[in-house]
């Protein structure tokens, strides 16, 4: 899956867009150069990547189904940002926000969990389809390597 991601980013067709990576000590983020990131035309992308960022993520073990907080290795974080870059380059980035699920707090208050659609697709959340690389597919493939 990682090879597919790199092949798509390195596509040498005549209308190739570029993805530039720079190192930052801030939160990792990927920005499109313009609105063509969302309309099928495609745009150049800029990734600002922090290799020391290690966010704690709610993760479910595929075998045991146990949910726990886990850090994210730097290579997974970079893959996540590169997937955003791939979407931006191809014009397939999604600006919408989606409703994930209704959550009830301990106090009985209910609220609707929302997430940018682009994040849900990039991560590969259950119920959000993506034929291409996702963070979760790369996680699964990388577990076979280590």
Regions found by a protein language model. Name each.
Residues 1-30:
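A metal-dependent hydrolase signature that marks the N-terminal structural subdomain at the beginning
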Residues 80-81:
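Conserved beta-strand->loop/alpha-helix structural units within folded catalytic cores of enzymes
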Residues 7-8, 65, 109-110:
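Polar/charged alpha-helical tracts
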Residues 72, 86-146:
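Active-site or metal-binding loop neighborhoods of secreted/extracellular toxin and effector enzymes
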Residues 4-8, 56, 99, 144:
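Acidic/proline-rich low-complexity IDRs
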Residues 19-76, 85-89:
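Active-site scaffold of zinc-dependent metalloenzymes
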């Amino acid at each position: 899956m990682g090879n597919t991601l790199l092949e798509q980013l390195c596509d040498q067709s005549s209308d190739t867009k570029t993805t530039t990576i720079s190192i930052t000590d801030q939160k990792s983020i990927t920005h499109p150069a313009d609105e063509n990131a969302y309309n099928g035309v495609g745009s150049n992308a800029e990734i600002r990547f922090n290799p020391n960022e290690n966010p704690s993520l709610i993760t479910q073990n595929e075998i045991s189904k146990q949910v726990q907080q886990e850090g994210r290795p730097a290579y997974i974080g970079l893959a996540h940002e590169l997937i955003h870059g791939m979407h931006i380059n191809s014009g397939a980035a999604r600006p919408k926000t989606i409703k994930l699920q209704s959550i009830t707090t301990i106090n009985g208050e209910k609220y609707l969990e929302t997430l940018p659609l682009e994040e849900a697709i990039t991560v590969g959340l259950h119920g959000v389809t993506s034929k291409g690389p996702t963070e979760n597919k790369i996680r699964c493939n990388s577990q076979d390597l280590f």
